[in-house]
């Protein structure tokens, strides 16, 4: 909703809810949305300490997502999952956000190998938004 109407209250609620979800179960999808919202908030606020906190928490969250998903990829059952391509997409975005471009590209290529046009479009749109808010 925030991206549609720029109402910061929607962004604050998203951060609160995604943050709770992330802290409860460390699901990569929830965590990626939490980190993204934190970066959006950092762009909106003038107060220096809060801006630093939001960006730090986003980076910390993405590093934990990377750790969790790298462990998952090494699990013998990984290829049986139905969301492998989205895990690759998430890893690509997380690595991109912490300036590990080679790893980001590696996982982007893995995502692109078997993705449909709408999935690629979704990935590219998310990547574009991420680049805009972290630069």
Predicted regions and their residues:
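Residue at a conserved register position within TPR or TPR-like alpha-solenoid repeats
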Residues: 1-2, 38, 45, 95, ...
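Short coil/turn linker motifs that delimit alpha-helical repeat modules in TPR/alpha-solenoid proteins
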Residues: 3, 7-10, 23, 79-80
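Structural motif corresponding to the intra-repeat A-B loop/turn of tetratricopeptide repeats
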Residues: 4-8, 41, 98
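Helix-turn-helix repeat elements of alpha-solenoid scaffolds
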Residues: 5-16, 53-71
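TPR/TPR-like (Sel1-like) alpha-helical repeat modules
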Residues: 19-27, 35-40, 53-64, 101-119
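Boundary/linker segments of alpha-helical solenoid repeat arrays
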Residues: 22, 27-30, 73-81, 113-129
């Amino acid at each position: 909703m925030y991206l549609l109407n720029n109402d910061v209250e929607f962004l604050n609620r998203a951060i609160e809810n995604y943050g709770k979800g992330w802290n409860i179960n460390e699901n990569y999808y929830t965590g990626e949305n939490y980190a993204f919202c934190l970066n959006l908030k950092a762009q909106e606020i003038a107060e220096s300490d809060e801006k630093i906190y939001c960006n730090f928490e986003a980076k910390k969250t993405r590093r934990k997502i990377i750790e969790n998903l790298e462990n998952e990829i090494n699990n013998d059952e990984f290829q049986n999952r139905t969301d492998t391509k989205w895990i690759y997409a998430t890893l690509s975005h997380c690595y991109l956000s912490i300036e590990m471009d080679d790893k980001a590209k590696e996982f982007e290529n893995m995502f692109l190998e078997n993705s449909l046009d709408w999935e690629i479009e979704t990935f590219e749109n998310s990547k574009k938004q991420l680049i805009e808010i972290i630069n």
